[in-house]
Structure formats: structure tokens, C-alpha cells
A protein has these predicted regions:
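PP2C/PPM-type serine/threonine phosphatase catalytic domain
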Residues: 1-262
Length: 262
């Protein structure tokens, strides 16, 4: 559960950091979840933040895990179709009668953020209040950090957005910039503690970059900060780097930067 303890592990290029909360602040349980797959050509990551028990987290993780072979097959599609296909597939799972029946039987509900990187693009599907960032020097200069916006009244589980007449979620696709892109996914425990330093994306950008420090150490330092700020909620981080050698889009009045891929 990692109560009063920071645990950071690396799986290939992907770092997962977990912190169960500060016991002296009243932490008793860890209801976060994480799932990552990678094969070198793509990454598939899920981060979850359960409410009122971890049963909904377990349900979502187990449901997606059972679809590994099907999702792996979808990831072989061309870049032009892969994101639409994976989104449609996941939404079909979440909207299936069998999954919705299981949701009715669990205690509590969960926020769920899914991310896929393939080639020089990144796609996400967000239900709830987890956040995903892309940190890059060019984006930093323009104050651009987050891909999604936190939604505080969306969940999967006993209270289920997919039970609504119109399910509510957000999704999107972004082109990654040329060079190093640092992808960071967090649960709200990283943001909502003490002085709430990381509710300001610039602070998280600064603490996840620089000083020739390994990514694993950056993640550890951020979670140590949460501990010292008496974070009561569990906090989870998934992060990895993607070095993009493809040309990125620039405006037409910067011809010196515009390159045409042949």
C-alpha cells in the first residue's frame, strides 16, 4: 500500500511512482491503480484514482488486462487509424452491458485516464480528475503543459458516466514536438496536498526536469514532497520520455523551422 513510503520502479523506459499517503495526516488506504504496456513502438498506460474503495480500480484494470491481445493487435494499425480504433474499442468495452452490470456491483467508483503514444503522436481518454502532461522546452516557453482538464464529477464504477444517456469523457490527440518529450500522468494526490505546489503545472515541470537527474529520481523527489506536505491521499505518477526525431508543425511565418517530410 506504500503508506508513509515512496516506491519508485522502472519497467523498461517507463517509471511508476507510488505513495500511499501520510499516516500522521490520516492516511489508511491506497485506492490508486496503474497499468502500463510497452513494446518499443508504442506505450499504453492507464492511471486510476479510486473513491470509496479500490473495487472499481480492480474492475477496470482487470477488464483492460484481459483485452491485452486485442489491444496489441489494434496497435499494429497505421498511425492514421490506430487512435480512432483504440478509442472505439475501449469505449465499446466500457459501454458493454456486462461491464456496466459489474460496475453496479462494486463499492465506489474511480477516475480513469488512458494514454497511448505511437510514433510522434499521443492520444488520451479521460474520465475524472487525473491529469496528463507533455513537458517539452518549446511548449514550456508558451506555458503549455497539460493535455486534459480535470473533471470532478465523472467516474467509472457504482456511479458510472457510461450509465448516462450521453456518457461524459474527454479525449484528444496531440503531435509531439521534435526532441525530448516527457510524458507525465498523475492522480490527484500529487496535486491536493499542503500548499498545493503541483496544482501549478510550471512547478511540476520544474521539478520533473533539469539538473541532469534521472527520471526515476525526479519522480521520487515529487512524491517525497507530497509526503513532507502531509499528503493524506494516495499519489501515483507514471512517466516516460519519448525522443521524437520527426519534424513538428510550425506556423507559416517561421519558414526557417518548417520542414517537409518526404
Amino acid at each position: 500500500m506504500c503508506l508513509d513510503e515512496v516506491s519508485v520502479k522502472q519497467y523498461g523506459d517507463i517509471v511508476i511512482g507510488k505513495y500511499g499517503g501520510n499516516i500522521s495526516a490520516g492516511a489508511k488506504k491506497n485506492e490508486d491503480g496503474a497499468l502500463v504496456w510497452s513494446n518499443g513502438d508504442w506505450e499504453f498506460a492507464v492511471i486510476l484514482d479510486g473513491h470509496n474503495s479500490a473495487e472499481s480500480v480492480d474492475l477496470v484494470v482487470n477488464t483492460i488486462q484481459k483485452e491485452y491481445e486485442n489491444i496489441k493487435a489494434i496497435m499494429k494499425e497505421s498511425i492514421k487509424t490506430v487512435f480512432r480504433s483504440v478509442e472505439n474499442y475501449i469505449l465499446t468495452i466500457f459501454q458493454s452491458p456486462s461491464f456496466k452490470e459489474k460496475c453496479e456491483r462494486v463499492k465506489g467508483e474511480t477516475a480513469c485516464l488512458i494514454c497511448v503514444r505511437k510514433e510522434n503522436y499521443i492520444w488520451w481518454l479521460s474520465i475524472g480528475d487525473c491529469l496528463i502532461y507533455v513537458f517539452h522546452e518549446e511548449l514550456h516557453k508558451l506555458g503549455q503543459y497539460t493535455l486534459n482538464q480535470r473533471q470532478f464529477y465523472e467516474w467509472i464504477g457504482n456511479v458510472n458516466t457510461f450509465d448516462l444517456p450521453i456518457p461524459c469523457y474527454s479525449s484528444g490527440i496531440r503531435e509531439l514536438r521534435t526532441g525530448k518529450n516527457r510524458i507525465v500522468m498523475v492522480t490527484d494526490g500529487v496535486l491536493e496536498c499542503g500548499e498545493r505546489r503541483y496544482e501549478t503545472p510550471l512547478n511540476l515541470y520544474n521539478d520533473m526536469n533539469g539538473n541532469n537527474v534521472e527520471l526515476k529520481e525526479h519522480v521520487h523527489n515529487v512524491l517525497e514532497h507530497v509526503h513532507h506536505q502531509f499528503g493524506r491521499d494516495s499519489a501515483t505518477i507514471i512517466s516516460w520520455d519519448y525522443e521524437n526525431d520527426a519534424y513538428a508543425t510550425y506556423p507559416s511565418d517561421q519558414p526557417e523551422k518548417i520542414k517537409v517530410k518526404k
